[in-house]
């Protein structure tokens, strides 16, 4: 599980990803976001808990702004995937309508430094 935090702006960070990272990071982002939902009690998400104690997964669920950053980044990685490969990534199709909502009771705090 990784987050390639290449820019503070999640859109810019998505645009500068290597092709292989665009493909893989959409799935990993979706898994971390689903894990955040499960951590806060919402089990109605497409992916099972994955790497619960990995620093990137912990960062994702730390607060609402971290979660929103990764969700926005994942969606723009999806846009990059579509531009580069001419199709929609399956994880975007499976997850966007669920993951666009914050997990219940996630703390409302400022965006925190990412754990590298």
Predicted segments with their positions:
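An N-terminal structural lobe/cap that precedes and organizes the functional/catalytic core
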Residues: 1-82
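Conserved small/polar residues in nucleotide/adenosyl-binding loops
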Residues: 114-116
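Conserved NAD+-utilizing ADP-ribose enzyme module
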Residues: 104-112
């Amino acid at each position: 599980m990784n987050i390639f935090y290449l820019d503070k702006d999640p859109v810019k960070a998505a645009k500068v990803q290597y092709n292989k990272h665009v493909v893989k990071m959409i799935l990993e982002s979706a898994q971390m976001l689903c894990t955040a939902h499960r951590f806060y009690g919402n089990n109605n998400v497409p992916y099972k808990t994955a790497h619960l104690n990995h620093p990137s997964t912990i960062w994702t669920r730390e607060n609402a702004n971290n979660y929103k950053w990764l969700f926005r980044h994942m969606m723009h990685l999806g846009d990059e995937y579509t531009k580069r490969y001419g199709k929609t990534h399956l994880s975007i199709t499976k997850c966007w309508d669920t993951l666009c909502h914050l997990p219940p009771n996630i703390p409302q705090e400022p965006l925190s430094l990412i754990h590298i």
